[in-house]
Amino acid sequence: MATPAPPRAVVFANDNETPTNSQRSGRPRTKPRPAPNTTVSWFTGLTQHGKQPLAFPPGQGVPLNANSTPAQNAGYWRRQDRKINTGNGTKPLAPRWYFYYTGTGPEANLPFRSVKDGIIWVHENGATDAPSVFGTRNPANDPAIVTQFAPGTTLPKNFHIEGTGGNSQSSSRASSRSSSRSSSRNGRSNNSSRNASPAPHGVGDVVGAGTLSVLLDLQKRLADLEAGKGNKQPKVITKKDAQAAKQKMRHKRVATKGYNVVQAFGMRGPGPLQSNFGDMQYNKLGTEDPRWPQIAELAPSASAFMSTSQFKVTHQSNDENGEPVYFLSYSGAIKLDPKNPNYNKWMEILDANIDAYKSFPKKERKQKPSGDDAATAPATSQMEDVPELPPKQQRKKRVVQGSIPQRSAGVPSFEDVVDAIFPDSEA
């Protein structure tokens, strides 16, 4: 009799088990992507095509942001050196500058106006140095905003704003990719952005509508700026303005390139009413000197000046009416903290500017003869080194000197006429 086959084991599937690759339907699981860089600027960069570094006049250089206030418009431009790998090695590319708000980006821990290579600070009038609420951009979620500046902003030569001109196609492709990503997210928020974004509806909205709103807001802001509702364009100092500045009290004046330090406050020197601070560059540019932000940090506030100075009223002279003229003399001290990130820059500035007048090139002033001496000796100062010639040779090359009445006062003698015609003959 045949042996019966053993019963087949029955296995019940677990609903929680994951099917194997052979049983799984649909596309295979994709590899996890690395986390995107979350320290990217909100704005497109500025490409530098020359040796001149990026620089903006005071009060300029902050990209337009539809959601920012003047107090928030402060930050830094950071240079990014680029290179490309070729068959013969690496080839450097034109550097590109990107803007970040204060307290954000790769230099988030850098104090406002700190000196560092490849970093320039910009701010609008009325901006504060507080860390910004705008954070940085996640390129996987949001496209870059094309950099735009307020009317009147002076962009250095050989700089190109990315996203304009030849880059319009790439910007369009980036917008379409971002639009498809945004529609699949269904309004998810950007975890890398802190608190706020320059986009008018925050992060995660459909890019088409968001971009249109940004353009409308920027257009309105540009119209307000042109109409004078926003920040005014930098004022050009004219001769009339300089003359009006002279009417201000001396200690209330502001030296600029159009009304320099010497014009506003006088020559540098050791006198009791003179200042010994200022090199040639500072004397020429005043507050438009690129070093001015660091120089201004050394100046005390009005409260500190009045509260930390030694004062003394001194009598210097009398005016035209004989009334006494008094001056308020003061002296004080400022501690230079070596822990401050600008300490080395301060020492460099102080070393270059204190008593710099002593090394200025001296100009020789021509003394103008006064009174009768001007008529009798008009050109003696220019002829001092000429050797004295014999009498006859002097008559050969006679130089008529003196005023017109003097030249016509006398008539030459017969001997002078003969010597002039026949220089080798004897009278």
UniProtKB/Swiss-Prot annotation:
PTM note: ADP-ribosylated. The ADP-ribosylation is retained in the virion during infection. Phosphorylated on serine and threonine residues.
Region (Dimerization): 249-359
Subcellular location: Virion; Host endoplasmic reticulum-Golgi intermediate compartment; Host Golgi apparatus
Comp. bias (Low complexity): 167-197
Keyword hit for Transmembrane: no
GO terms of molecular function: RNA binding
Pfam families: CoV_nucleocap
Highest taxon, organism lineage: Viruses
Spans annotated as Disordered: 1-72, 144-204, 361-411
Bias-annotated ranges (Polar residues): 15-25, 36-50
Positions of the UniProt region annotated as RNA-binding: 34-172
Occurrences of domain CoV N NTD (ranges): 38-163
Identification of the protein by name: Nucleoprotein
Record organism: Bat coronavirus HKU5
